[in-house]
């Protein structure tokens, strides 16, 4: 199995679980300033509708994690949780991803819960 090399490569916030986890904790004005007016499509699964993206971000805030299933690359999917500071602003993201063929919706939710737990542990380690 080949793994993508995303080091030093800017990734689209709207088409990755890590980007969505980060965006979820920003205010609407901040998101509007960061995201392009038109969200580019990378695969047939990429969310390009702003209102649909806003619904996904609201769900990410509710559950604590964001999911991405083949939205940036056809062969990968993952779940991510933001590490929040004391003001509940995102300072980092815990990302768990793998081959889309091995990640069912149930597994993505499990990965998301694991990412939330790890993000909380990191937050606690960073707290003064």
Placement of each model-derived feature along the sequence:
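Amphipathic alpha-helical regulatory segments at dimerization interfaces
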Residues: 25, 63, 121-125
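Acyl-group handling in specialized metabolite and lipid biosynthesis
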Residues: 44
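Extended hydrophobic
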Residues: 48-118
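Cysteine/selenocysteine-centered motifs that mediate thiol-based redox chemistry or coordinate metal-sulfur cofactors
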Residues: 33-41, 116-128
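Generic alpha-helical structural context detector
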Residues: 20-24, 58, 120
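Amphipathic alpha-helical effector-binding/dimerization core
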Residues: 1-37
């Amino acid at each position: 199995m080949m793994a993508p090399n995303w080091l030093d490569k800017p990734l689209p916030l709207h088409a990755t679980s890590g980007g969505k986890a980060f965006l979820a904790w920003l205010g609407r004005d901040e998101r509007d300033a960061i995201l392009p007016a038109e969200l580019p499509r990378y695969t047939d699964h990429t969310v390009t509708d702003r209102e649909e993206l806003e619904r996904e971000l609201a769900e990410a805030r509710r559950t604590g994690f964001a999911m991405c299933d083949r939205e940036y690359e056809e062969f990968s999917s993952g779940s991510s949780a933001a590490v929040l500071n004391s003001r509940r602003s995102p300072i980092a993201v815990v990302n768990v991803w793998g081959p889309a063929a091995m990640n069912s919706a149930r597994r993505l939710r499990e990965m998301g819960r694991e990412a939330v737990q790890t993000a909380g542990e990191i937050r606690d380690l960073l707290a003064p």
